[in-house]
Design a protein with these regions (language model features):
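A generic structural signal for short beta-strands and their flanking turns/coil linkers
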Residues: 101-103, 163, 184-188
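A recognition module on extended beta-rich or small alphabeta surfaces enriched in W/G with H and D/E
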Residues: 184-190, 196-199
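Extended serine/threonine-enriched, polar tracts that run as long, contiguous segments within proteins
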Residues: 166, 174, 191-196
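Sec-dependent N-terminal signal peptides
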Residues: 1-13
């Protein structure tokens, strides 16, 4: 409860410091998210709490844990709190309350700018940004129906970014949106998962009042480093797996050449045990 209250207070503070308010939110969906960190042995399931905040002209999707982490570490008072919580976690050997990044560093902004999806990510210790055309997903409707959070839902399937997705959309909520980059159905997606169940999003709460506005976050107030989707994803995989010299990684090389950051730690080469969410790069 204390974490939730603190998060709400920081939400208002961050919006006041570095932000672009896009539009008032009309509905917000909270999803329980699971991903397999080891898709071979399936022994490491990571969980997260994701937020989809929807307005009339744009929406945003992000990890609540990552937002909490970024809010703390990019605020002078919050940094002191984060350091105290981190030290306490090590002292107690209990890291459950330590500020941490969730399953992803990504913040997604749909239809911002119009007809585009913008992603920001600070995994390379510099706030990177790329945008892409709003995905056109070829969904195939099925006859299966079920109820989620009291809403009648219909099933649809599609191949998207190298995965076979199943989505359940609410037929009584005519909002063409959903978790992550999924959307394009005649109703709000309340559950989605890929064929191997490596990634799953399940709605656990729908909120329609007292909402924060849909807001484009810039936590440190510095300009974003712009790139493109495939360059970012290729570089991310190479960085995480320690492939080759860190300064030969495409995006890191560009960041260093720009002067935004000078040094990166060389990671030990290893095989990633999980498949990234997107496979088409």
């Amino acid at each position: 409860m204390k974490t939730t209250v603190f998060l709400l207070l920081f939400s208002a503070q961050v919006v006041a410091q570095h932000h672009t308010r896009l539009n008032p939110a009309t509905i917000e969906v909270h999803y329980h998210h699971t991903m397999q960190r080891d898709t071979v042995r399936r022994l490491a399931t990571e969980t997260d709490s994701m937020i989809l905040r929807i307005g009339a002209s744009a929406s945003q999707f992000f990890s609540r844990h990552t937002f909490y982490y970024d809010s703390l570490w990019n605020d002078p008072d919050g940094r002191a709190t984060a350091e105290a919580l981190t030290l306490e976690a090590f002292r107690m050997r209990n890291h459950s309350k330590e500020p941490r990044v969730g399953t992803t560093y990504d913040y997604l902004y749909k239809n911002y700018p119009a007809g585009r999806v913008t992603t920001t990510n600070e995994q390379f210790h510099v706030a990177c940004r790329y945008d892409e055309a709003t995905p056109s997903i070829s969904w195939v409707m099925a006859d299966s129906i079920r109820t989620i959070l009291g809403h009648p839902c219909r099933m649809a399937t599609a191949d998207f970014r190298g995965r076979r997705w199943t989505a359940w959309f609410a037929t009584d909520i005519p909002v063409s949106d959903g978790p992550w980059k999924l959307g394009g159905l005649p109703g709000l997606i309340l559950e989605a998962y890929d064929r191997g169940d490596d990634y799953r999003y399940t709605a656990v709460r729908i909120v329609e009042s007292g909402l924060q506005p849909v807001t484009f976050y810039c936590f440190d107030g510095k300009p974003f480093f712009d790139t493109d989707r495939r360059t970012f994803l290729r570089s991310q995989r190479a960085f995480l797996s320690g492939q080759g010299n860190v300064y030969d990684i495409e995006l890191i090389r560009a960041i260093v050449q720009s002067g935004r950051r000078k040094t990166y730690m060389q990671r030990e080469a290893h095989r990633l045990l999980f498949d990234p969410l997107e496979r088409d790069y």
